[in-house]
Amino acid sequence: MPIGETQSLAIKLDNTGHRFLPGQKIRIALSTAYWPFVWPAVNNPTLTLAEKPACLSLPMLVNLEEKDVQPNPPVAPPMSAITQKRKPNSNRDVEYDFNENKVKLKIKDDLGKLLYHKHNLVTSAIKHEYYEISNNAPLSSMAQISWSFEYSRDNWMTRTITETIMTSDEKYYYLKAKVRAYELSLIHISEPTRRLV
């Protein structure tokens, strides 16, 4: 997009539905950043909204009759017998480090540990995510994600652990990954590093 020039843009909002009552207002916020879902732009851009001819066009649903969208919904098969050996748990922590001028986001999603009685398989999955960025320094961005999957039955057990780190500079994204595979003990390890444009 050209810098310093006025551009005419049409932005389609996520499909959603809302009923506005008389007197209610809607507010829209525009941003050049959506960290950590979208990697930040290198030059820390700014956005100015021209007052005219900015407009918001909302579609209106005129016929408010209820519709049977799916008259014959699919029927799921019966649940197999499962025992929960570890409850799922999810944590999200945001840390503001004022000394380093950084924002850190830590996410842990433990999907639990389950025993499937039909085939006596035990499954477990845990995900860790860590993101950090310095204020007004988009090149300081770092994302780190790891997954641990475990499958076991009787005296047999396999486990995989994946770790991925992403950083960037003005030209490239850098991906560093590590995969470890276990069958009772470590049997495979791989550590590729890639530079992407």
Question: Where are the regions that the model predicts?
Answer:
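Glycine/threonine-rich phosphate-binding loop and adjacent beta-strand/alpha-helix elements that clamp
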Residues: 1-190, 194
